[in-house]
Amino acid sequence: MSELTAKENIKTADTVKRITATAVMAALTTLMTAYIFHIPVGVNGGYVHLGDTMIYLAAAFLPLPYACAAGAIGGGLADLLTAPVWAPATIIIKMLICLPFSSKGTKLVTKRNVVALFLAFAISATGYYIAEGIMFGFTASFFTSVSGSIVQ
């Protein structure tokens, strides 16, 4: 009976560590997106920021569900603080950009994670193009969203 309890305690401690790391990454994502190096770009509320780097780190370090939560919560909170109209789209897009990454190995820089950066860019650019197209029209979105994504 005590062995089972010890195993449960280890599993609980592991879960607490992961949840804590997720919360820290979400907070860092919010800060890096909304306040640190926050440069408005374009006419539709977009801005250049370093928040995505925190999401990429979370995706490389944390298991996928935790990384998705960190990205969605951090990015969503940043948009609620700066450009609330974008929050629903951001929550979905930031979860999706975590999908190509891997946290299975001990190395942070792997071929898969380097390729994942480019896939994440494509997911983000496409997601914001669609969101902006729904809000402002697809013709205008092509010029404003795509150019903003390239700058980001």
Where do the language-model regions lie?
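Loop-helix junctions at membrane interfaces
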Residues: 1-152
